[in-house]
């Protein structure tokens, strides 16, 4: 086909996303605000690795915590294997990511006295409570909510 004859713009074509875990569903839900999305998964839609994650999501949410403390904890716990700029990026963006999940209905365990009303835990290597969780099945809770939202979105085909 002659490229000059192609009148279809890339913006009018659906975006194909491979994978139905946290990353794939997040991208799909955001892109579906303005275009059609197709999600493909090699196994069943409920069989992503996201659903198996138990612990929680780390974030700088408490005013007593800081990005610098989070980065320091991550680098120290990483025994020389952590790229500091990557750890810093994650620490800087973590609160926004957790806010997005909360805004999308993820049922994190709550604590009225906790930062943003969330119950935070402290796990190995962390100097502050900074792990938001949904009981002991955080990944499952996140995956179920985002998958249900994707199934309900008319711009997303699964």
Residue ranges and their predicted role:
Residues 4-6, 41-158:
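Conserved N-terminal/central alpha/beta ligand/cofactor-binding core
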Residues 9-12:
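Short helix-loop-beta connector
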Residues 1-5, 24:
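A generic local structural motif
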């Amino acid at each position: 086909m002659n490229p000059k004859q192609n009148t279809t713009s890339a913006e009018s074509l659906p975006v194909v996303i491979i994978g139905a875990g946290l990353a794939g569903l997040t991208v799909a839900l955001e892109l579906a605000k303005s275009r059609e999305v197709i999600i493909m998964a090699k196994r069943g839609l409920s069989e992503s690795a996201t659903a198996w994650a138990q612990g929680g999501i780390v974030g700088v949410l408490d005013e007593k915590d800081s990005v610098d403390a989070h980065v320091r904890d991550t680098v120290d716990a990483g025994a020389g294997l952590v790229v500091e700029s990557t750890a810093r990026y994650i620490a800087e963006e973590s609160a926004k990511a957790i806010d997005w999940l909360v805004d999308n209905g993820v049922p994190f365990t709550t604590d009225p006295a906790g930062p943003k009303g969330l119950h935070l835990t402290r796990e190995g290597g962390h100097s502050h409570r900074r792990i938001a969780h949904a009981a002991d099945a955080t990944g499952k809770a996140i995956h179920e909510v985002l998958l249900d939202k994707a199934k309900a979105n008319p711009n997303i085909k699964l």
